[in-house]
Each structure stands twice: as structure tokens, then as C-alpha cells.
Amino acid sequence: METHIGSVDGAAAAADNGAVGCPASAVGCPMTSARPAPVSAGEASLGRHLARRLVQVGVSDVFAVPGDFNLTLLDHLIAEPGLRLVGCCNELNAGYAADGYARARGVGACAVTFTVGGLSVLNAIAGAYSENLPVICIAGGPNSNDYGTNRILHHTIGLPDFSQELRCFQTVTCHQAVVTNLEDAHEQIDTAIATALRESKPVYLSISCNLPGLPHPTFSRDPVPFFLAPRLSNKMGLEAAVEATVEFLNKAVKPVLVGGPKLRVAKAGKAFVDLVDASGYAYAVMPSAKGLVPETHPHFIGTYWGAVSTAFCAEIVESADAYLFAGPIFNDYSSVGYSFLLKKDKAIIVQPERVIVGNGPAFGCVMMKEFLSELAKRVNKNTTAYENYKRIFVPEGQPLESEPNEPLRVNVLFKHVQKMLNSDSAVIAETGDSWFNCQKLKLPEGCGYEFQMQYGSIGWSVGALLGYAQGAKDKRVIACIGDGSFQVTAQDVSTMIRCAQNSIIFLINNGGYTIEVEIHDGPYNVIKNWNYTGLVDAIHNGEGKCWTSKVKCEEELTEAIGMALGEKDCLCFIEVIAHKDDTSKELLEWGSRVSAANSRPPNPQ
């Protein structure tokens, strides 16, 4: 049994792939019904072959920055009718955009030039690697005749060895290919793309600048779709894992389920919800899994994030006598400085290909999606934890009413953001206090949600917003970005305007790096204030559609949101003036615990 990439059948299967919360047009795996346009034999060049392969796997947009080593390749990408080249202001944002696009569409791609472009995009590719996103990073390389000649080229560090870029990418991609001849090019390209999809990680593909326009018989006129053999469980291991887990859970009094971020890569969102339905357990999500499973399910109890969890969620999870974590990542951020009150002997850890029950046994070659589906058939129904939650739950209060023209509070801002959400919207949360405020948003069915928790690179959200909005055109995306993060990557607001996107950006201007203030304060956390609306107006420059507003009180915010919701075909930028000390209580708690973890003294030698 094999999975057919690029077929109508594959697209139909993808609609039920378990990627709950993803747009219908942007399934969690990169199968689409897009068919590359046929070309004549004379046009069957390397560049067109790559372009058609990208279209086959679901890439409609490539985020690029031109440079002399990739110009010919870009010509061939542009020539493919099913592919659009999105020119970005810098390579970092192009990489972030490919990251956001992969979140929306299942796979993304960016194109840069040799070394100066490659090393610039490297940070974004590292982030995509940490978040398990298949991004195809294409770099234009030197002329194939220059390899091994002892020549020194521009855009290098002045050595005749051209491998510096390749070696940098080896640590942040799952596969690397340097294409310097036509004979093997088709295999190198196909292997790189297939590996990205199979591993759900970025790949690096360097193509010599003199090759894209050259034809070769292997670049067939009507390319036959390649196949990805699906990963299957070892049946004996699967049965043993299910049996051990059923025994573990069925003897528990108040078991719970917790969804983690690797539900995405395992395409197990639907299987997880099916297990909730079958078991009756209360379920929560880890913060980086928000948006991967529905929050409208009656047994959903919120975000489990240790000391900064949703109210009453941590009490239920940590008091359970058995907890199944599906696809967790336990790092210092998600564990609030390693302060989780969890016991390993009570935990079942289900990773995409492995199950660990308590302190053992462990079962390898067990696919999460299959495991959860089989478990749902055999686990006993037990609603005790959910009933306990209902007994202690007290509805969350509302922010204090604002006085007329009172300076705007951040909790009032997010009260209004909550009202904006529906099934046609999505939320992008930047690293910082927006992490914590956006976690408290209650997502309607079908509302998307993305943030970058594992890598946590400030500025990610601007490029990711560009890419996500380009990949999910059925969504109106709402981005919450701090001023410090915005200063890193602000330029590509111009690309959003060029692409006629209609996202709504809330720029929270509180004068500094708030999240870092709460971890460790110092004068370096204060930034130069910008006229952010003036900056965006200057970027707009009368070309395209863009509307800006600066708000300082709730009355102005209400009016601005009303205008933004009315401007449905326009990029809307709302600068929110906030007090520098106006932070969520969760950030205050989280920051102190992460600070304590960071400042641990060295272990005695």
C-alpha cells in the first residue's frame, strides 16, 4: 500500500487525515489535486521539472529573494502556471513565510541565493526543523564548472571550498542535495522533496546556476507522480502496546488525556478526538498543541501548562492517577522551568512512532494514529476526571470595565480579540506576552492557531503571517505581535500589501521586550519607540490596500476593530499603546520560574 502524491484519490484521502483544525483547503499532509501544466519536450528543463514537482505536492507559492546565482531558476519557477513567486524583503522572512505556509498547506518552499542568502534564511529553517515542518529550501549554487577548480567566488567567505553553506544546513535539515549535473538531478530533486514530506522536516536543495534551463530526457513531459510508502506499525508491537495501555488505563480511577504538538506530524488529531469520545476522559492540550484539536468539545478542560495552566486544568491533570500524553514536547518553556508536578509512573507517553507505558515497557514502530484508533476500540468509558472538573470549575471573570478614555489595558484588548474569532479566522501569536494572552482565547470550531514555541525566535510572526495567509486564503488571519518582535522583521508588511492580503495585525506597543523583562530585566530590554502606524503608512505608499490606526483607549479600539472588520479586502494594522508593565499574570509566574531554571548554579564537580 502506498500513498499517491498529487492524485485526486490522494486529495480525497487527505481530507480525513486527522489534521483537525486545519483549513479544508490546506490539509495536514501535502496531497492536492493540482496537476502541473504539460510542457513540450524542449521545455522539459531542470527548472521546470522542479517547478512541476512543487505544484504536485501542493506548493502554489514559493517565497524568494533573488540573487545572481538563482535568477535563471526563478525564471523557470515563474513560468510554471500553477506556481506563484512571492518576492520577500529578506531571506529570513522568506524562510518564516515558508514556515507559515507549511502550517497552512502541509508543505512550504523558499528560494534564495548562494551563501549570503542561504545563511540568512538558516535561522528560519532551524525554526521549521524544531517545529517539524516540511520546508523545501532551494538555493541557487555556483556554476557546475567551478566546483573543484580552486577558484574563489563572490558571495563566499573567500575560500575555494564551496561547502560552507551545505555544512551549515546539515544540522537544521533532514536531507541535503547539491545538484551539479543533469544525469542525477531528477533523482536528487525527487528524493529531497519526498524526504521532506516523509520526515516532516526541512530539506536543503542547491542547484547550480547554469543548470535550470537545460533539458534532459529524465525531465519527462508529463511527470509520473512519485510515491511515498506510508509508515506502518509493527502489528505485534501495536497489539502489545494497546494491551499494556488498556490495562494501565482501565484500572485507573480518574485518567485524563493531554494532546501535544506532535499530533500534527503524526496526523493524529482526529484519532485523538475519537479516543476522547470513546473513553469519556477529560482532555487538555499542551500550549504548543493549541489549535490542533477542537476546543468546543464538551470534555475539553483547557491548556495544561503547569503553574500557568488554564484555571482548574492543572489541578485535574496533576491529580489524575493516569495521564496519556499524545505527542508531547517537554522542554524548559513548556514545563515552566521544569516545574511540572507529574509522575513518570503514572504517564503514558505516545510519540509519533513510539509508546512508553509508565516506567516501562516501551514499544517501538507503533504509529500514533493507529495506536490511538485501536485504543479507542478497547478502553473502558470513564468520565470521573471530567465530572471532577465540572464540580470545581468556576467560569472565568471579565476584565474590569474601563473608565471613559482610560489608558487601554491588554486584557481589554484580548476581550475584544475573542469576540472577533469565528470559523473563518486564524490567530498567529508572536513570542512574548502574546503567547500567554492568546492561550486564553477560546477557539471556535475551525479557527486556526499557530505560534512557535520550541524555537521561540522573536520576529517569526511577521513572515509566518505572510506565509500562512497566502496558504489559507479562506481565513482572515489575526496576528498579535509585540513591538520588539516587530522591529526584527517589519519589512515584509510590504509583501502582504503586494499580495493583497487582508490580515489584521495588532501591534502591541509597550516599549520593550516584555517577556525578557520578566525573565531577567536590564537596560537592554528597552527599545527605541517607533511611529509604527507611520512606518506602515510609509511602506504602503499609496500602492495596494492598507489601513492603519493607533489606539490608546477602549473607545478607540472598539472603533478601530469595527473599521477593520468592515475592510474585508484590506490589510489592517492597529497599533495598541499599552503600559510597559501591563503583562499577563501567567507571564509573571512563567518568567520567574524560567529565570530560576536559567540561573541554576553549576553542578558540583
UniProtKB/Swiss-Prot annotation:
GO terms for molecular function: magnesium ion binding; pyruvate decarboxylase activity; thiamine pyrophosphate binding. Its cofactor is a metal cation; thiamine diphosphate. It catalyses: a 2-oxocarboxylate + H(+) = an aldehyde + CO2. GO terms for biological process: aromatic amino acid family catabolic process to alcohol via Ehrlich pathway. Its EC number is 4.1.1.1. Belongs to the TPP enzyme family. Pfam families: TPP_enzyme_C, TPP_enzyme_M, TPP_enzyme_N. It is an enzyme of class 4 (lyase). GO terms for cellular component: cytosol. Binds 1 metal ion per subunit. Binds 1 thiamine pyrophosphate per subunit. The keyword Magnesium applies. Keywords: Decarboxylase, Lyase, Magnesium, Metal-binding, Thiamine pyrophosphate. This is Pyruvate decarboxylase 2. Substrate binds at D68, H155, E516. Homotetramer. The keyword Repeat does not apply. Residues 433-515 are annotated as: Thiamine pyrophosphate binding. It comes from the Eukaryota. Mg(2+) binds at D483, N510, G512. InterPro entries: DHS-like_NAD/FAD-binding_dom (IPR029035), PDC/IPDC-like (IPR012110), THDP-binding (IPR029061), Thiamin_PyroP_enz_cen_dom (IPR012000), Thiamin_PyroP_enz_TPP-bd_dom (IPR012001), TPP_enzyme_TPP-bd (IPR011766), TPP_PDC_IPDC (IPR047214), TPP_PYR_PDC_IPDC-like (IPR047213). CDD domains: TPP_PDC_IPDC, TPP_PYR_PDC_IPDC_like.
